[in-house]
Amino acid sequence: MKFIIKLFPEITIKSQSVRLRFIKILTTNIRNVLKHLEDDTLAIVRHWDHIELRTKDDNLGPEICDALTRIPGIHHILEVEDRSYSDMHNIFEQTLEAYRETLVGKTFCVRVKRRGKHEFSSGDVERYVGGGLNQHIESAKVNLTRPQVTVNLEVDQDKLILVKARHEGLGGFPIGTQEDVLSLISGGFDSGVSSYMLMRRGCRVHYCFFNLGGSAHEIGVKQVAHYLWNRFGSSHRVRFIAIDFEPVVGEILEKVEDGQMGVVLKRMMVRAASQVAERYGVQALVTGEALGQVSSQTLTNLRLIDNASDTLILRPLISHDKEHIINLARQIGTEDFAKTMPEYCGVISKSPTVKAVKAKIEEEESHFDFSILDRVVSEAKNVDIREIAQQSREQVVEVETVAELADTDVLLDIRAPDEQEEKPLKLDQVEVRSLPFYKLSSQFADLDQSKTYLLYCDRGVMSRLQALYLREQGYTNVKVYRP
């Protein structure tokens, strides 16, 4: 099986040295993402205008293709088949054999790309093959403007490349071509989308989480960060830094005037994140702030928040409205996480200012004990995001993991609804119930607690984290199902 990986167009307009560097980084990223397949026949070769991937194991094709569509820097992926040919008529015969069933009752056009010296042009092949297909498939009709099927062919020297399928890529720049950033992640719609946008633009995104809601909140945000990394950024190692911000919030509640609390809290977060960024050599912070969305996100307040630190703050969503942000979250798969993620920042100020005055803010901050901020930063927990899955195993070691089910057990499929539809879970003589992970906290108590519930997800990370959460809530009738 062979894939031709086409580069994001902005890469192709770079200078020769930059373009070669980007292609080299993208090739390395692809290798890193696919190394878990342990396929000895996998070969990846970079060229000037594309990257070629081959494997002898056809069963891995769908998994490889799915992974490639989630790697930044790729415009599209062509699933192709190499063949030899003798002349233009032979090209037509092979194309007819490959596309006859596909074109029945459809409109079509033929598009050809050619490399090398030949006695014919690309247009010659398009007309000859297209005319032949039109004659030999009676129900097929040519439509050059809006065809239902596009027959893509490539003639490379003495090889005919039949394009069996085209898959759209993520676009953007390969991760690692730009410098590292630190995302202030809360688990909501905005921070998840802003993190994704910087990954897509070529940045390795580390995560900084300010914990205001205890272990349950931290577990939820870890799920979001791990999901984003695993889905779009697993080519690189990244950090997840958790800072216990409850002492800072307590000091603000005690020392700062009500109306100024929101801006002061954001300034404290920026100060703390800047210290973390400096410690690890990160160049910029990323937030999910959008202009005018909440009281602290007016231009006046954002300017005051920026002034708390010299570190560059990037706000990729600054001009986006909430509906658009939610749509983006739905596209990348973080919507379900964000729907049930509690928002703690908004509860600390009853009448927040929308136009803070610098002198007033500084006066309020003069009452603040900054040793508390320094202490929570020094005590921050820093983990490799790849260890989150391992940590979840260690944290729920008291939660039994089983591979077989008893007749009286109830299997809870906690995957998102779209995942359940794509890969339905059916087991003989076992009751299977659907309860997505984001509804567990609110609906698990409604279940019959005399039964034992086995939580299932594809990779086992989400089920372990949710099992830990339920155990913390006092439920002992929970296990993890790993077939």
UniProtKB/Swiss-Prot annotation:
GO terms for cellular component: cytosol. PROSITE patterns: RHODANESE_3 (PS50206), THUMP (PS51165). Its main location: cytoplasm. Pfam families: Rhodanese (PF00581), ThiI (PF02568), ThiI_fer (PF22025), THUMP (PF02926). It is found in: Cytoplasm. Catalyzes the ATP-dependent transfer of a sulfur to tRNA to produce 4-thiouridine in position 8 of tRNAs, which functions as a near-UV photosensor. Also catalyzes the transfer of sulfur to the sulfur carrier protein ThiS, forming ThiS-thiocarboxylate. This is a step in the synthesis of thiazole, in the thiamine biosynthesis pathway. The sulfur is donated as persulfide by IscS. HAMAP family: ThiI. This is tRNA sulfurtransferase. It comes from Yersinia pestis.
